[in-house]
Amino acid sequence: MAVVTTKQLLESGVYFGHATRKWNPKMKPYIFTSRNGIHIINLKKTSEEIEKAYQELLNIITSGGKALFLGTKKQIQSAIREEAQRSQQYYVDHRWLGGTLTNFKTILKRIELLHLLHKQEEEGLWKKLPKKEVVQLKRKRDKLEKFLGGIKDMKDLPQAIFVVDPEKESIAVAEARKLGIKVFGIVDTNCDPDLVDYIIPANDDAIRGVKLIIWLMANACVEGTGGVAEKAETFDAKNPLKPQNYNAPNKRPYQDSPRKPSYQNQNQNQI
């Protein structure tokens, strides 16, 4: 039985690509046609690639591996966090810190500090400190939790990383590839498919569609750990269909927000 239906993909709007003038020629095999200056992604290809990604991720998790879910766009942060937690995997839903994978020993030290701060607070040690110092400690803890909370239980590098928009998360993708970590990614028509090992051609601005794919990858992880994957009805209940305005200016259909520039020159030293 297919893990996703064409109807689900149609309803979620994953088939609308970018403007034809912005396309990456390497995405040609995944494009069906163009309409009103917008590329239309081939849903048959999307379905096939989702199946491949699902099975490979399932195999990795079944073999005892772990996955890291990465998506920092504001509209999908909650989905990344909730689905990673549901499937008992790691996640990063805020800015990626340079060196998270390639300089993991340093990241582990920050994680140890985060655990220490939590322990100190739980044991009541902060009650003995001046109020000003407690405020500073809480601020430090909250900042560490924001950027490292999703990987605070990660003792070793993951075997797979699932990325929403590999172009935006280029530093994370480069780190994973350097270390031989399998990269799964939602790739739009303006992206380079060579960045990832398992491509899922889809509109990365279609919020419901992106959530659908995140949900599917989480299901693969749930199955891989011996659990029961959620049914489509559960996803639909959590993400009801909304009417779309196909005539909205300066937007692709199903695009929930305009694109924002990506700032990737940030590093772990800022926390």
UniProtKB/Swiss-Prot annotation:
Q: Which Pfam families match?
A: Ribosomal_S2 (PF00318)
| Sample GO molecular function, one term | structural constituent of ribosome
List the residue ranges of the region (Disordered).
235-271
GO BP annotations, alphabetical order: translation
Q: Which keywords does this chain's UniProt record carry?
A: Ribonucleoprotein, Ribosomal protein
**The UniProt record lists the keyword Ribosomal protein:** yes
User: Known InterPro entries for this protein?
Assistant: Ribosomal_uS2, Ribosomal_uS2_bac/mit/plastid, Ribosomal_uS2_flav_dom_sf
A GO cellular component term found in this entry reads: cytosolic small ribosomal subunit
Q: What is this protein called?
A: Small ribosomal subunit protein uS2
Q: Where is the composition biased (Polar residues)?
A: 262-271
